[in-house]
Amino acid sequence: MGACMSKNDEETEQKKRSQKIDRDLEEDSKKLRKECKILLLGSGESGKSTIVKQMKIIHLKGYSDEELTNYRPTVYKNLLECAKAVVNAMHQFDIQPADPSLRPYVEFLQDYNMEGCPPGQSIDPKVGTAIQALWNDPAKEQLMERQTEFYLMDSAEYFFTEVMRIVAEDYRPNEMDVLRARTKTTGIYETRFKMGQLSIHMFDVGGQRSERKKWIHCFENVTSIIFCVALSEYDQVLLEESSQNRMMESLLLFDSVVNSRWFMRTSIILFLNKVDIFKQKLGRSPLGNYFPDYSGGNDVNKAAKYLLWRFNQVNRAHLNLYPHLTQATDTSNIRLVFAAVKETILNNALKDSGIL
């Protein structure tokens, strides 16, 4: 009889334990179902908005035909900004086209603008002819030797290569055009998507100096920060202050983020972005010219490791730092990187919820 009672007690105890485990699992699952808040930070033009566009392509079924068409004015604007930057630099450095017959194209591009045109209007095809002719002229090499002395959008070469497709009357941007298109982020842009069992709420915050004071109310309960750095900006200056090196500005911003009291328990995912442009630049613009203590030549891995070391040096709070070399315009690269990032975010979410 006693043995029977004992057996029943044991079964009851086991059932209670099993129910508690089920409740705990359900509770853990609920905690994980809460949104993970991801803050995208970095200085202007570091690639944050491109990452958001990639999330739409990878996790939210991409862009509809209408959304692609809506990017047309932005692509036109970027193309003209790039063309005007080139012709203004030609004037600034007194560089003439090697072929004198191309000089009228320089004046044409300088004077052309689309302001006041109806929203659906196509760009003048002559813009394409002018850009193509000037970009294929030998004077381009002279100009590119002085690229650190003037501002030219990273996507300029892409848009110039694609110019005849862009100026066609029936032009509709494709996803690569959208990824390359640049609009200044002002304020805070939010996007939500699922990544496996995780619900992600991502905030893209304006990178220009004037935007930074608006970040503060985003800081509460952040699961992870993705901090974007454009590796290629080591030889560039700020749009807002032409005496300030962009990489030094990124380091200062990173310092203020990583050592902030708001982020004492947050891990930082560091995207060393624009590695493709960085690789192209190192040969013609040595990193050592801007960071005299660097001695690794134009080896891209040594150069990237050196810059990562510089970022680690300012991490006085000793937050967990997860670095990734990225090319934000390459969907397959970002897909791979985010497979690793997902693990980091998941672990942080588990820690935040008390499961780990």
Swiss-Prot record:
<keyword id="KW-0460">Magnesium</keyword>
<comment type="function">
    <text>Guanine nucleotide-binding proteins (G proteins) are involved as modulators or transducers in various transmembrane signaling systems. Involved in conidiation.</text>
</comment>
<keyword id="KW-0749">Sporulation</keyword>
<protein>
    <recommendedName>
        <fullName>Guanine nucleotide-binding protein alpha-3 subunit</fullName>
    </recommendedName>
</protein>
<comment type="similarity">
    <text>Belongs to the G-alpha family. G(q) subfamily.</text>
</comment>
<dbReference type="GO" id="GO:0003924">
    <property type="term" value="F:GTPase activity"/>
</dbReference>
<feature type="lipid moiety-binding region" description="N-myristoyl glycine">
    <location>
        <position position="2"/>
    </location>
</feature>
<dbReference type="GO" id="GO:0005737">
    <property type="term" value="C:cytoplasm"/>
</dbReference>
<dbReference type="GO" id="GO:0030435">
    <property type="term" value="P:sporulation resulting in formation of a cellular spore"/>
</dbReference>
<comment type="subunit">
    <text>G proteins are composed of 3 units; alpha, beta and gamma. The alpha chain contains the guanine nucleotide binding site.</text>
</comment>
<keyword id="KW-0547">Nucleotide-binding</keyword>
<feature type="compositionally biased region" description="Basic and acidic residues">
    <location>
        <begin position="7"/>
        <end position="23"/>
    </location>
</feature>
<dbReference type="InterPro" id="IPR002975">
    <property type="entry name" value="Fungi_Gprotein_alpha"/>
</dbReference>
<dbReference type="InterPro" id="IPR027417">
    <property type="entry name" value="P-loop_NTPase"/>
</dbReference>
<feature type="binding site">
    <location>
        <begin position="273"/>
        <end position="276"/>
    </location>
    <ligand>
        <name>GTP</name>
    </ligand>
</feature>
<dbReference type="GO" id="GO:0007189">
    <property type="term" value="P:adenylate cyclase-activating G protein-coupled receptor signaling pathway"/>
</dbReference>
<keyword id="KW-0479">Metal-binding</keyword>
<feature type="region of interest" description="G3 motif">
    <location>
        <begin position="200"/>
        <end position="209"/>
    </location>
</feature>
<dbReference type="GO" id="GO:0031683">
    <property type="term" value="F:G-protein beta/gamma-subunit complex binding"/>
</dbReference>
<feature type="region of interest" description="G5 motif">
    <location>
        <begin position="326"/>
        <end position="331"/>
    </location>
</feature>
<feature type="region of interest" description="Disordered">
    <location>
        <begin position="1"/>
        <end position="26"/>
    </location>
</feature>
<feature type="binding site">
    <location>
        <begin position="204"/>
        <end position="208"/>
    </location>
    <ligand>
        <name>GTP</name>
    </ligand>
</feature>
<feature type="binding site">
    <location>
        <position position="49"/>
    </location>
    <ligand>
        <name>Mg(2+)</name>
    </ligand>
</feature>
<feature type="domain" description="G-alpha">
    <location>
        <begin position="34"/>
        <end position="356"/>
    </location>
</feature>
<keyword id="KW-0807">Transducer</keyword>
<dbReference type="Pfam" id="PF00503">
    <property type="entry name" value="G-alpha"/>
</dbReference>
<feature type="region of interest" description="G2 motif">
    <location>
        <begin position="177"/>
        <end position="185"/>
    </location>
</feature>
<feature type="lipid moiety-binding region" description="S-palmitoyl cysteine">
    <location>
        <position position="4"/>
    </location>
</feature>
<dbReference type="InterPro" id="IPR001019">
    <property type="entry name" value="Gprotein_alpha_su"/>
</dbReference>
<dbReference type="GO" id="GO:0046872">
    <property type="term" value="F:metal ion binding"/>
</dbReference>
<feature type="region of interest" description="G1 motif">
    <location>
        <begin position="37"/>
        <end position="50"/>
    </location>
</feature>
<keyword id="KW-0519">Myristate</keyword>
<dbReference type="GO" id="GO:0001664">
    <property type="term" value="F:G protein-coupled receptor binding"/>
</dbReference>
<feature type="region of interest" description="G4 motif">
    <location>
        <begin position="269"/>
        <end position="276"/>
    </location>
</feature>
<keyword id="KW-0449">Lipoprotein</keyword>
<dbReference type="GO" id="GO:0048315">
    <property type="term" value="P:conidium formation"/>
</dbReference>
<feature type="binding site">
    <location>
        <begin position="42"/>
        <end position="49"/>
    </location>
    <ligand>
        <name>GTP</name>
    </ligand>
</feature>
<feature type="binding site">
    <location>
        <position position="185"/>
    </location>
    <ligand>
        <name>Mg(2+)</name>
    </ligand>
</feature>
<keyword id="KW-0342">GTP-binding</keyword>
<feature type="binding site">
    <location>
        <begin position="179"/>
        <end position="185"/>
    </location>
    <ligand>
        <name>GTP</name>
    </ligand>
</feature>
<dbReference type="InterPro" id="IPR011025">
    <property type="entry name" value="GproteinA_insert"/>
</dbReference>
<keyword id="KW-0564">Palmitate</keyword>
